[in-house]
Amino acid sequence: MEDFVRQCFNPMIVELAEKAMKEYGEDPKIETNKFAAICTHLEVCFMYSDFHFVDERGESIIVESGDPNALLKHRFEIIEGRDRTMAWTVVNSICNTTGIEKPKFLPDLYDYKENRFIEIGVTRREVHIYYLEKANKIKSEKTHIHIFSFTGEEMATKADYTLDEESRARIKTRLFTIRQEMASRGLWDSFRQSERGEETIEERFEITGTMRRLANQSLPPNFSSLENFRAYVDGFEPNGCIEGKLSQMSKEVNARIEPFLKTTPRPLRLPEGPPCSQRSKFLLMDALKLSIEDPSHEGEGIPLYDAIKCMKTFFGWKEPNIVKPHEKGINPNYLLAWKQVLAELQDIENEEKIPKTKNMKKTSQLKWALGENMAPEKVDFEDCKDVSDLKQYDSDEPEQRSLASWIQSEFNKACELTDSSWIELDEIGEDVAPIEHIASMRRNYFTAEVSRCRATEYIMKGVYINTALLNASSAAMDDFQLIPMISKCRTKEGRRKTNLYGFIIKGRSHLRNDTDVVNFVSMEFSLTDPRLEPHKWEKYCVLEIGDMLLRTAIGQVSRPMFLYVRTNGTSKIKMKWGMEMRRCLLQSLQQIESMIEAESSVKEKDMTKEFFENNSETWPIGESPKGVEEGSIGKVCRTLLAKSVFNSLYASPQLEGFSAESRKLLLIVQALRDNLEPGTFDLGGLYEAIEECLINDPWVLLNASWFNSFLTHALK
């Protein structure tokens, strides 16, 4: 066959075919049938274009003798046979000059007279089967398809054959000649049988043996083999008969497919009710730190020593009083708990040697705050299984809450830069492979963009608190241990800094199962006056505990310092995940990496450096009521990181449900934007599934409101 190809086809065509095969890693000496098919296809494309010109008036004319005086332009631009980069360049420039829609796949020709791209097919099978495969693959109304067969049949979009009868007859005659030449050498049968459908990876992948039997067994009823099913799916016409097809497949299914148009979707209904409240395990934007720079005190690194040292940097303590009571709690107990912490810290200092950990006295206020002896008594099932009216507690439906503006402010704050660095640039050995070099370059650029981000501070704070709490829960199960909330960072000048946010006191923690709860009381410093947004602090009792002098542009001002106190709880599994919060960095790095990959594949070279260093370019960050928000690549990194961190801080069943269900609607809207004419059934049911997750969670409500902004702009 290889010899035949080299004799039968023009050397230029043979050379182009060899080049094309090598580009895809195929060997013309081994895949000889494919070699022949590519040469045939190239020759048909060239013959299609030969002798066809457009004159000065744009009329199509055929000129066979080479009249050198004619000022003529070729009617067809040949795209097939060029290397990929060049071919796309040609396609792009045609699209730019003519305004025609850019095709998803490289077409074979462009027709200047009809202003359309043409896909040429040459098949050894039935023309209509091959036509359907082509149409299914390119899925574009705009590209014209023209199929020829070796038996003299042809098929074209809307039976519009583009060329005159004679030109097409020339092509058919040539194909017939090739077939006869092959047959006379005994090559035709193998060539005819070797044709596969429009190749996709799956189709080249032969399924055999057990897998083949499993595939044939797992088909819907009425299909005998995978081939049948595949042919059926490929020729599937989406509009009109899905309902019938569904009912053929199963009697149980009854669905009317409704077209999904720009006017179809409605916004998500957000719940009404009082504004939602803060529910994170620690304060975020409202946190205040007492810090020491370049710590070098005795016992540096032991949390209790660090905490006492930080407390000593502040001189404005005063008699605490309650400024915002907790609606349901016994507020004086919160006040007494704080006074007890101060007193016991004072006691430690009076001792000769400061202990490494501090267990609080089990006072009545702490027992109350930590729910000691509050759990209902457990009774063995054997003793009560005969009780006739044994039933589970009735639990109330959660009260609906409306979206409050504070959660958007929290998110904005999380995307901002602080003046400290919260993660170190990892010192990693020399890169061995080029891919490692690219990977570490990306990681370093990314780290530089996010190391000072507030969301990164939240990660390190979360990791520290969860680690300390889990350790204490295992090491001191019965004790009310005092756990300082600490983080470490570096200043702009590179000096180390230790920060104290407040304290946690943990309750009894006999955690046998992953979901067993340990109660804790958190006490956190803040300069935020809770009376400005009382709804945000519904779960807190807030004390005023001191006055802090702040340096401002107009000199020193004194601001009241508050302590946010609340009872909270967590479980082993939540703490384990909290300790893993650094994964948020990885998740957002991967999202950025896929953006770089997309850019690199278009430009056909690694774009990492340009991506991070081209400051003029802006990228879409998210949707807001104003429209699509854009920002620098650093802002994109920080926004993606903040989203990932908030998913961790505000993790909940409501978020799980909302993410899973809203994603389905998102995909349908994306399909509509990509002109894929999506259809849906039971859209109402999907809305119900999404909206049943919108109850009272601030992060879920914010995401739902973003989703509504997206719908508005996506469907304009």
Swiss-Prot record:
Alphabetical UniProt keywords: Cap snatching, Endonuclease, Eukaryotic host gene expression shutoff by virus, Eukaryotic host transcription shutoff by virus, Host cytoplasm, Host gene expression shutoff by virus, Host nucleus, Host-virus interaction, Hydrolase, Inhibition of host RNA polymerase II by virus, Manganese, Metal-binding, Nuclease, Phosphoprotein
GO terms for MF: endonuclease activity; metal ion binding; RNA binding
Enzyme class: hydrolase
InterPro entries: INFV_PA (IPR037534), PA/PA-X (IPR001009), PA/PA-X_sf (IPR038372)
Top-level taxon in the UniProt lineage: Viruses
Signal sequence range: none
Any one Gene Ontology cellular component term annotated for this protein: host cell nucleus
EC number per UniProt: 3.1.-.-
GO biological process: cap snatching; DNA-templated transcription; symbiont-mediated suppression of host gene expression; symbiont-mediated suppression of host mRNA transcription via inhibition of RNA polymerase II activity; viral RNA genome replication; viral translational frameshifting
Classification via Gene3D superfamilies: Influenza RNA-dependent RNA polymerase subunit PA, endonuclease domain
Keyword Metal-binding: yes
Compartments it resides in: Host cytoplasm; Host nucleus
Description of post-translational modifications: Phosphorylated on serines and threonines by host kinases, including human casein kinase II.
Motif (Nuclear localization signal 2 (NLS2)): 184-247
Extent of motif Nuclear localization signal 1 (NLS1): 124-139
Residues annotated as binding Mn(2+) 1: 41, 108, 119-120
Free-text remark on how the cofactor is bound: Binds 2 manganese ions per subunit.
Physiological role: Plays an essential role in viral RNA transcription and replication by forming the heterotrimeric polymerase complex together with PB1 and PB2 subunits. The complex transcribes viral mRNAs by using a unique mechanism called cap-snatching. It consists in the hijacking and cleavage of host capped pre-mRNAs. These short capped RNAs are then used as primers for viral mRNAs. The PB2 subunit is responsible for the binding of the 5' cap of cellular pre-mRNAs which are subsequently cleaved after 10-13 nucleotides by the PA subunit that carries the endonuclease activity.
Record text on subunit structure and interactions: Influenza RNA polymerase is composed of three subunits: PB1, PB2 and PA. Interacts (via C-terminus) with PB1 (via N-terminus).
Family: Belongs to the influenza viruses PA family.
Extra remark: SC35 was derived from A/Seal/Massachussetts/1/80 (H7N7) by serial passages in chicken embryo cells, thereby acquiring a multibasic cleavage site in its hemagglutinin (HA) and becoming 100% lethal for chickens. SC35 was then passaged 11 times in mouse lung, yielding the mouse-adapted variant SC35M.
Name listed for the protein in its UniProt record: Polymerase acidic protein
Gene: PA
